[in-house]
């Protein structure tokens, strides 16, 4: 058994379709993070937010900005470097036509751990919104700079990013910002004016994928933008037909128990209880 049921809001997706002159959106990729047209694909990559924790609980915004720029350039390069499937030329044609990339995040919950912010709280919602706005702003800014150097995506005329008939609108936060978390300000007017002058390299720039496997490889506890799945659990892996069971325990949770003064036996007992009953 694999996968869970989900709900797709088709009308909402088409209202945000960056290339409505090419097609109406009908479906997503298998994981559901990116709506795609016929034969389209999207080159994905995710920034590990857990790496931007500072000792004082703050966020290393400057390093996050630099890495967002680098990742955006990298993903645009991937569009060119992909081998695609030679027997299906439409795959390459569709990819180069809109040059979709999907820069996302993982480890948001990890970053909240270190910042002392509770996931799901009003502070947590604002913190997540500020993080993603920052990433999106600098991904779009970099894509515009790439358009200057390499040219905009070929299907830009008639798209929402058409410099002559720009219909794209800057995002409006549904959450009132109360804190700034020492985050540098972003000016969306700069993005609007720059698109009018230079266009943009990629029809899509950001998307948040589930990152289940790559988060595990990277040592993240929070997949994508999700809260931590569980503080302790057993992961089932298909090992050549047999069920390989891997026991997982949250390093952050274990550290908190250590800091609280619990010995190894007490920690083991708590992990076993959490594994069986949840937390």
Each language-model region and where it sits:
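Long, C-terminal-biased catalytic regions of enzyme "large/alpha" subunits
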Residues: 1-279
């Amino acid at each position: 058994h694999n996968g869970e049921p989900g709900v797709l809001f088709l009308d909402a997706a088409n209202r945000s379709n960056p290339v409505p002159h090419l097609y109406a959106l009908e479906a997503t990729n298998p994981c559901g993070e990116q709506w795609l047209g016929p034969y389209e694909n999207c080159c994905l990559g995710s920034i590990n937010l857990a790496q931007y924790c500072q000792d004082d609980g703050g966020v290393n915004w400057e390093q996050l900005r630099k890495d967002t720029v680098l990742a955006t350039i990298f993903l645009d390069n991937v569009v060119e470097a992909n081998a695609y499937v030679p027997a299906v030329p439409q795959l390459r044609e569709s990819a180069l036509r809109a040059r979709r990339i999907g820069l996302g995040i993982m480890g948001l919950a990890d970053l909240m751990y270190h910042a002392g912010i509770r996931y799901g709280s009003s502070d947590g919602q604002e913190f997540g919104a500020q993080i993603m706005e920052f990433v999106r702003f600098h991904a779009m800014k970099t894509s515009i700079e790439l358009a200057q150097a390499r040219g905009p995506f070929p299907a830009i005329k008639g798209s929402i990013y058409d410099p002559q008939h720009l219909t794209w609108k800057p995002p409006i936060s549904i959450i009132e910002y109360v804190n700034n978390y020492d985050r540098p300000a972003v000016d969306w007017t700069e993005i609007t004016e720059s698109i009018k002058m230079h266009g943009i390299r990629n029809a899509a720039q950001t998307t948040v994928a589930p990152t289940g496997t790559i988060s595990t490889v990277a040592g993240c506890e929070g997949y994508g933008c999700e809260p931590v799945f569980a503080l302790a659990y057993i992961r089932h892996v298909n090992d050549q037909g047999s069920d390989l069971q891997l026991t997982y325990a949250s390093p952050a949770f274990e550290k908190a128990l250590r800091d609280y003064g619990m010995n190894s036996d007490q920690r083991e007992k708590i992990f076993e209880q959490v594994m069986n009953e949840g937390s």
